[in-house]
């Protein structure tokens, strides 16, 4: 419960959404942390785009808002889903904050694909098996040639296309959407 204790101690919570009520990470934290209503919030909207210039501008803007709070002597907790080191917007913002000389720390989470494997009662890799984590918002055709288990992440925006590719390649697939949440689908 290191994450819960950290959120309880931090007076400012950064939420990666237009409004915290839209953030799954906020709803999860609010169910675990008693004093969430006492917090100040930074709603840090990051657009879903591959345009590096737009993304970098948003990362800089988010880092600036967090640094403003740090300059006031306040600690800030940034909410993420899963593990912040795997395809998380936080890592881009964290690098900027670190480069500006501020101390940061990361509390590991449970990667969604590990939670999904547990839910399915399946191993991701045994002995010498390879495990490949692939962002399916990019071209997955080449990645499907890799040996071992392939985990396709971030596929929501291209789900129909991903399904077609998997069907075409006759790949054995197991899928969980919103693993561990009320609207989970297997």
Language model features: what each stretch is:
Residues 1-102:
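Class I S-adenosyl-L-methionine
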Residues 85-146:
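Class I SAM-dependent methyltransferase SAM-binding "motif I" and its flanking Rossmann-like core
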Residues 144-186:
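A contiguous loop/helix-start segment that scaffolds small-molecule binding in enzyme catalytic cores
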Residues 73-77, 130, 149-151, 172:
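Residue-level preference for the first positions of well-ordered beta-strands
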Residues 41-43, 104, 133, 173-175:
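Conserved beta-strand scaffold positions in the cores of enzyme catalytic domains, especially
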Residues 5-6, 70-71, 78, 123-127, ...:
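Solvent-exposed alpha-helices and their adjacent loops that cap or buttress functional pockets
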Residues 20-22, 49, 111-114, 181-183:
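Short gly/pro/ser/thr-enriched loop/turn and capping motifs at secondary-structure boundaries
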Residues 45, 79-81, 134, 152-154, ...:
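Short beta-strand segments
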């Amino acid at each position: 419960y290191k994450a819960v204790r950290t959120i309880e101690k931090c007076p400012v919570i950064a939420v990666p959404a237009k409004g915290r009520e839209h953030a799954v990470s906020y709803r999860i934290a609010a169910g675990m942390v008693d004093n969430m209503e006492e917090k100040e919030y930074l709603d840090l909207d990051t657009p879903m785009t591959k345009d590096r210039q737009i993304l970098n501008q948003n990362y800089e803007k988010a880092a600036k808002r967090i640094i403003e709070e740090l300059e006031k002597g306040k600690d800030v907790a940034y909410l993420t889903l899963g593990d912040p080191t795997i395809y998380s917007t936080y890592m881009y913002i964290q690098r900027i904050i670190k480069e500006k000389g501020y101390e940061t720390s990361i509390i590991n989470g449970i990667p969604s694909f590990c939670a999904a494997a547990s839910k399915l009662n399946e191993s991701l890799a045994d002995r010498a098996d390879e495990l490949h984590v692939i962002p399916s918002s990019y071209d997955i055709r080449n990645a499907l040639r890799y040996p071992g288990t392939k985990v396709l992440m971030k596929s929501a925006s291209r789900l129909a296309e991903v399904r077609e590719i998997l069907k075409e390649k006759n790949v054995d697939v197991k899928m969980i959407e919103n693993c561990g949440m009320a609207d989970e689908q297997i």
